[in-house]
Amino acid sequence: MGDVEKGKKIFVQRCAQCHSAQANLKHKTGPNLNGLFGRQTGQASGYVYTDANKAKGITWQADTLDVYLENPKKYIPGTKMVFAGLKKANERADLIAYLKQATNL
């Protein structure tokens, strides 16, 4: 299990430029991540996804996020996400722990 506070720092440094996590905030360059867990790829209301994201058809959970966050372009070829990924498993675990808390409020 990851460290929520470390995950928050990673989110602020690596994700917050393009994503928000709190309810009722608009999409940025990337979709708002509120309600992420349990949602299928390409399904955030009001955000325009690539066909690749819409067609992937997986549900976001800790295990799918772990694989995606390691190398987004490998997991979903054709995604427009420019983030190269987090290679360290502990950093992914920390970010996922934060996202579980922050996106389900």
Curated annotation (Swiss-Prot):
Gene Ontology CC, one term: mitochondrial intermembrane space
Give the record's keywords alphabetically: Electron transport, Heme, Iron, Metal-binding, Mitochondrion, Respiratory chain, Transport
List localization entries.
Mitochondrion intermembrane space
Would the keyword S-adenosyl-L-methionine turn up in this protein's UniProt record? no
Q: Which residues carry this modification: Blocked amino end (Gly)?
A: 2
Primary localization class, coarse = mitochondrion
Checking Pfam families in the record gives: Cytochrom_C (PF00034)
Q: Sorted alphabetically, which SUPFAM superfamilies does this protein's record hold?
A: Cytochrome c (SSF46626)
Q: How is it modified after translation?
A: Binds 1 heme c group covalently per subunit.
Against InterPro entries, the record matches this protein to: Cyt_c-like_dom, Cyt_c-like_dom_sf, Cyt_c_1A/1B
Locate the residues binding heme c.
15, 18-19, 81
What are the disulfide bonds?
none
UniProt GO MF annotations: electron transfer activity; heme binding; metal ion binding
The protein's role, per its UniProt record: Electron carrier protein. The oxidized form of the cytochrome c heme group can accept an electron from the heme group of the cytochrome c1 subunit of cytochrome reductase. Cytochrome c then transfers this electron to the cytochrome oxidase complex, the final protein carrier in the mitochondrial electron-transport chain.
Q: Which family does it belong to?
A: Belongs to the cytochrome c family.
This chain belongs to the protein called Cytochrome c
Organism, by scientific name, is Macrobrachium malcolmsonii
